[in-house]
Regions:
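A Zn2+-metalloprotease active-site environment signal
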Residues: 2-287
Length: 287
């Protein structure tokens, strides 16, 4: 899903709620951006987000995501592959997103200001993603080939939203830039240069960015909790990945799984965390 734009009108809106020198730069960056930890009432345990992300300005990486998302939609529209507002599958996706979005802000206070958007692109790809800044896209292939239930769609969407909320792209950009670029960004944050050069150049990389296994595990668990709080059955996380494994076997491997490693270990982690969020799911279903 994560092979990786600000429009004037959003399709969705939020429903409501190291060496000494480098250490110095990290401290300065950390002071510029508040620590991103798990919400106090979180049921899953994912710890604090990577401090490395503070070396890349959040607003710059979000702006890059918004720009690339807009370019992707324009390309799809030119090929008559962008679903219209009346498309039943798109309406379904947006309805699911409306249930998930209210639970996003506790995981990242910046999400309160994001102009959330969901779109559907006609493609056989088994894929979906959420850009920094809350820009979500699904490909028809993931819905049609896997025949996803609403609960399974919510698990996919929650997982992708979690990547954006936990700022995995921002952290990966900082880590892949190397020490020299990191020091340069740190200097910029200290007022010694133009801020955001790296993030401004990073837009073309967001759509193909690969996350680490720890990022994927974190997204699985945060997405699981988001979906459970929104009233989606957490057991669907297991059925989703079983479907993904079957599809990969039948098709000789999926490009999707190159960035979303599958296997028994992943399912085992989800199964171990389902009991932690089942009460959230039951409460949501009662309300």
């Amino acid at each position: 899903m994560c092979t990786r734009c600000e429009s004037s009108t959003s399709a969705l809106s939020p429903a409501s709620p190291w060496q000494p020198r480098r250490a110095f730069l990290l401290a300065a960056a950390g002071a510029a951006t508040a620590a991103l930890g798990a919400p106090a009432l979180a049921q899953v345990n994912v710890g604090n987000a990577s401090v490395a992300r503070n070396l890349v300005p959040a607003d710059k990486i979000e702006a890059a995501g918004v720009q690339q998302y807009g370019q992707l939609l324009a390309q799809a529209r030119a090929k008559n592959a962008l679903a219209g507002d009346n498309n039943a599958q798109l309406q379904r996706l947006r309805a699911i997103a409306q249930r998930l979005i209210p639970f996003a802000t506790p995981w990242n206070t910046r999400a309160r200001e994001w102009k959330w958007e969901v779109n559907l692109i006609g493609s056989k790809q088994i894929n979906a993603f959420c850009m920094p800044g809350g820009k979500i896209a699904f490909f028809t292939g993931i819905l049609e080939q896997l025949k996803l239930s609403d609960d399974e769609v919510a698990m996919v969407m929650g997982h992708e939203m979690a990547h954006a909320l936990r700022e995995h792209a921002r952290a990966r950009m900082a880590k892949s830039a190397g020490t020299g670029a990191a020091l340069s960004i740190g200097a910029q944050l200290l007022g010694l240069g133009q801020v955001g050069d790296l993030a401004a150049r990073a837009g073309t990389q967001l759509i193909t960015l690969k996350f680490s296994r720890s990022d994927e595990t974190e997204a699985d668990l945060v997405g699981l909790e988001l979906a459970a709080r929104a009233g989606f059955d957490p057991k669907a996380s297991v059925s989703l990945w079983n479907k993904m494994a079957t599809a990969s076997k039948n098709q000789g491997g999926l490009s999707f799984l190159s960035t979303h490693p599958s296997g028994t270990d992943r399912i085992a982690k989800l199964e171990a965390n389902i009991p932690k969020v089942e009460s959230l799911y039951r409460n949501a279903k009662r309300s």
